[in-house]
């Protein structure tokens, strides 16, 4: 039997003589290892996090710095850096909402708080020696190449600029979080298609 379960079993007893299905209570003076009622650790963490804000649990939106406007140049720059394409206005609106939520961290007082660290900062991580084992023959290596030229890999060109025409209605997206709607506006292509039908 697991040592943890032995500790729990020895520190609890049945509330009645029958005890079938009844709540277990610890003996007097015993340390409780398991809480009587489950609690949501995420909610508890969120409350503790909010208590560290300068202005309590309620966040004063006027203290936040101004939201940067999202334009076509910024979208293409983010797409090039992240290699992720925004496929709809909802994706751009979600990005704007994430920026807005991240700006609340500016109000967190981190004075006298040590930065987080990982266990790897104080532990050694041994790696294998870089010793060549059995080299693969060239024909097996070239199986991974879709296109070849004079026994060289041909890679697709990188950082190709995407189309510069505006795919989204950015005026509506920049007003989206101030309107207070839970979802982003309809896609520009859908609105244009419906306008043609009329």
Swiss-Prot record:
One of its GO terms (cellular component) is mitochondrion. This is Glutamyl-tRNA(Gln) amidotransferase subunit C, mitochondrial. Allows the formation of correctly charged Gln-tRNA(Gln) through the transamidation of misacylated Glu-tRNA(Gln) in the mitochondria. The reaction takes place in the presence of glutamine and ATP through an activated gamma-phospho-Glu-tRNA(Gln). The keyword Membrane does not apply. It catalyses: L-glutamyl-tRNA(Gln) + L-glutamine + ATP + H2O = L-glutaminyl-tRNA(Gln) + L-glutamate + ADP + phosphate + H(+). It comes from the Eukaryota. Subunit of the heterotrimeric GatCAB amidotransferase (AdT) complex, composed of A, B and C subunits. Its main location: mitochondrion. Signal peptide: none annotated. Its EC number is 6.3.5.-. This protein may be expected to contain an N-terminal transit peptide but none has been predicted. It is found in: Mitochondrion. HAMAP family: GatC (MF_00122). Belongs to the GatC family.
């Amino acid at each position: 039997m697991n040592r943890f379960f032995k500790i729990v079993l020895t520190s609890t007893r049945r509330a009645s003589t029958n005890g079938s299905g009844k709540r277990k209570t610890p003996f007097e003076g015993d340390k409780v290892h398991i809480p009587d009622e489950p609690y949501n650790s995420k909610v508890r963490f969120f409350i503790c996090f909010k208590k560290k804000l300068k202005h309590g649990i309620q966040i004063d939106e006027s203290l936040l710095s101004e939201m940067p406007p999202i334009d076509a140049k910024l979208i293409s720059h983010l797409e090039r850096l992240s290699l992720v394409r925004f496929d709809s206005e909802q994706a751009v609106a979600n990005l704007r909402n994430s920026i807005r939520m991240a700006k609340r961290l500016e109000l967190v007082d981190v004075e006298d708080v040590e930065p987080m660290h990982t266990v790897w900062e104080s532990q050694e991580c041994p790696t294998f020696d870089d010793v060549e084992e059995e080299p693969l023959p060239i024909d097996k290596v070239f199986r991974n190449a879709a296109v070849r030229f004079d026994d060289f890999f041909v890679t697709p060109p990188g950082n190709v600029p995407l189309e510069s025409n505006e795919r989204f209605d950015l005026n509506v997206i920049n007003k989206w979080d101030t309107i207070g709607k839970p979802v982003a506006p309809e896609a520009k292509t859908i609105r244009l298609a419906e306008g043609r039908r009329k």
